[in-house]
Amino acid sequence: MKQQFAAKHPWTILAAGAAIQVLTGLPAAWGVFQKPVMEEYGLSEQGAGYAFALLIAAFGVGCVLGGFLQDKKGPRCAALWGTALLCGGFFAAAFLPGWAGWGFFLAFSIPAGLGTAFLYPSIQSCAQKWYAGRKGLATGVIGGAVGLSGAFLTLFVRAALRGFGPVQGIRGAFWALGALTLPVCLAGSAVLSDPPQKKQQPSGKNTLDLSPGQMLRTKQYWLCAGAVCFSTPAVLLFSPIILKLGMERGLDETAALWSIVLGSVGSAAGRMLMPMLSDHIGRRATDLGLFAASLALSAAFWAAQGWWVVVCYAGLTFCYSALAAVLPALSTDLFGLPHAGVNYGFLALGQSVGSLAFPFAANLLALENGRHLLAMAGAAAGFAAIWALRPVQKDPR
C-alpha cells in the first residue's frame, strides 16, 4: 500500500527523507556543542575535538553496516535502527553524569555517529532509486536538508543554553533533541520503501551492477575513497574550533556565531545545488571545480581576519558539503544502483580515515598553521584523485 502511494507520489520519499535529515546534521553544528560539552562533562578542548572526530569516524563505519542492512532488509529497517541509535545517543548524553566525561565518547559519539550513518545512506539510496533518471535532484534535496540541519541545531542549542521552558542547558538540549527526533524519524522511516524493480532502472547508460567485493577490486574505488578522505581537513579541522578561531581573529562571540549559521547555509546550498549541476556537467567536472575552489578558499582562510573568516568558512562548507552530496550519485554512476547502500558505505570509510588521521596529524604538528597546511594539501590531493578517475569499463571478476 505504501509503495503504491509512493509510486503515485514519489515526492513523499523526498519529503520524508528531508524531514529526517533536518535533525541529523550534527557535524555541521558541532561548533555550538563544543564549549558547553567541555564545560558540562569536564572535557578538554582536545578531548571534545576527539569526541567530534569519533562521531565522524563512527558515521563512516555505520555507513557500511547500515548499507548492508539497507540492501538486505530495505531502507525502512535501516532507518528505524538509525532512529534508535541516534535518539539513544541524545538520551544517553542527557543522562551521563558530569564526572563521567570519559563516557561521552561511548554514550554519544559512537551511537549518534552510527545512527546518522544508518539514516543517511538508506535515505539517499532510496531516493536515487525512485529518481533514477534525476539522481542529482534526489541527492540535492536530501543533502540540502542536511545542510539546513546545521543552522537549525545551532539556533536550537543556543536557545537551550539561554533556557526556554523545561529545556535548560546542554543536557536540556540533548533531552529535547531526542524527544523531537524520535517521532519525526519514526514517521519518516515508515514512509521509506524501495520502488518496484522496473522503476529503479536508470534511463541512462550505466548498466553496471558491482557488488561490494567487485567494487573494492577497482582502481576507481580507491581513487573515490581517497578523494573523500582528502576532502575532510578543509572543514573538519576547523568546525570544532570555529567560534574560538573567529574571536581570535577579531569577531565578538555573536559575530563568530554567524560562522556556524552561514556555514550551515553554505552547506545547504552546496548540497542542494551542486548535485543538480552535476546532472548537467558531470560528476567528475563538478568535483574538480569543488576541489579547486576548496584549495583557493583554504589558502584565503589562512590569512582571513574579521568577517572574512565567516565568508571563507561558509565557502569551505559549501565545497565540502557539495562534494559529500555528489558522492552518492558518483557512486551509482560508477558502480551501479543495486548495491548502492553498502557501496556508498565503503566509500564513506574515507571520511572516517580523514576525520581521525588529519586531527591527529594537526595535533602532532602542534601548530595552528598546521591545520591550514593540511587543508590545502588535502584539497590538492583530492583534485589529483578525481583528475585520475575514469569510468569502470567492465565488471571486475
Where do the PLM segments sit?
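A late C-terminal transmembrane helix in Major Facilitator Superfamily
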Residues: 141, 150, 334-367
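C-terminal transmembrane helical hairpin of 12-TM major facilitator-type secondary transporters
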Residues: 234-237, 249, 255-330
